[in-house]
Amino acid sequence: NVSALKRCYVGLIHRVNNVSAPRLPLKSYEDKSSFKIFAVDIGLLGAMCDLDSDTIVRGNNIFTEFKGALTEQYVLQQLKLKHEPFYWSKPNARQEIDFLIQTNGGIVPIEVKAEENLKAKSLKQFVLDNHPDTAYRTSMSDYRQEEWMTNMPLYCVPVI
């Protein structure tokens, strides 16, 4: 029950709603029945999941499975400073864009990667289908401008 969850975690979570279509304005396509929940802070998320520093430093199997969630959490925290992020998933398909933001009269898709694995099939298909002016992939890789998107190192996410 979402309302019970809200009462229990009021002030501790961010809710990121899906949009039914990647069109302007994003808010008018918001689907409040489909959403992702994030902690308000990456440290709080780690504490809620009993993630200790040894797990992060040593990179054991638990962290290998969890670092994608931590990376998405970090990116959301940075985006929330300037934007209202949404996400988008294609109905009945495996295509999902981690975050969509509306800025400068356009929609910007953002794909989040935890490592340097730079496959971004969903992002590439989104760009082909929707022709945004800007598309970002965030990762541990260096800044790189490609023909169809920009790779932003995770430390540069605040400038998006």
Walk through the language-model features, giving the residues of each.
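C-terminal tail/extension regions appended to the core domain(s) of diverse proteins
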Residues: 151-160
